[in-house]
Amino acid sequence: MKLEVLPLDQKTFSAYGDVIETQERDFFHINNGLVERYHDLAKVEVLEQDRTLISINRAQPAAMPIVVHELERHPLGTQAFVPMNGEAFVVIVALGDDKPELSTLRAFISNGRQGVNYHRNVWHHPLFAWQTVTDFLTVDRGGSDNCDVESIPTHELCFA
């Protein structure tokens, strides 16, 4: 099956998480007016007594064509990825309680200046780079037992 890749924007992505970007976002000045602060762009959630981690993930480009056959989710915390090199990247998401609901399966491509924050329990494809090795600033929950993985029927990404 083919899965069309759509441009990433907050309106179409909102059911799955937050788009982390400055475009069309409010800000206020700090540091004597030298800095524009784009405040509270994503809601970071960590359940239980675990802590929030900030890491850098270096992702390798996916083999082409990009084929999706499994999704994962994190029930105990959100997970954010922000590309550090200005590279566009692809995110693949779905809703669903026990298993991904294929009717909600979507693929998006960022513009290189956007990151994403997946809501808790949102099914998504494991992180990969699109065209070149990419470093991602990653914010997520520390601790174990926070990853469910499900196989899905194979979908091939279709770039419009």
UniProtKB/Swiss-Prot annotation:
Record-stated family: Belongs to the ureidoglycolate lyase family.
UniProt keywords, alphabetically: Lyase, Purine metabolism
Disulfide cross-links: none
Primary enzyme class: lyase
Complex and partners: Homodimer.
PANTHER family per record: UREIDOGLYCOLATE HYDROLASE, UREIDOGLYCOLATE LYASE
Molecular-function GO terms, alphabetical: ureidoglycolate hydrolase activity; ureidoglycolate lyase activity
Entry EC number(s): 4.3.2.3
Required co-factors: Ni(2+)
Reaction equations catalysed: (S)-ureidoglycolate = urea + glyoxylate
SUPFAM superfamilies attached to this UniProt entry: RmlC-like cupins (SSF51182)
Pathway note: Nitrogen metabolism; (S)-allantoin degradation
Domain of life of the source: Bacteria
Protein's UniProt name: Ureidoglycolate lyase
Function description: Catalyzes the catabolism of the allantoin degradation intermediate (S)-ureidoglycolate, generating urea and glyoxylate. Involved in the utilization of allantoin as nitrogen source.
Any single GO BP term: purine nucleobase catabolic process
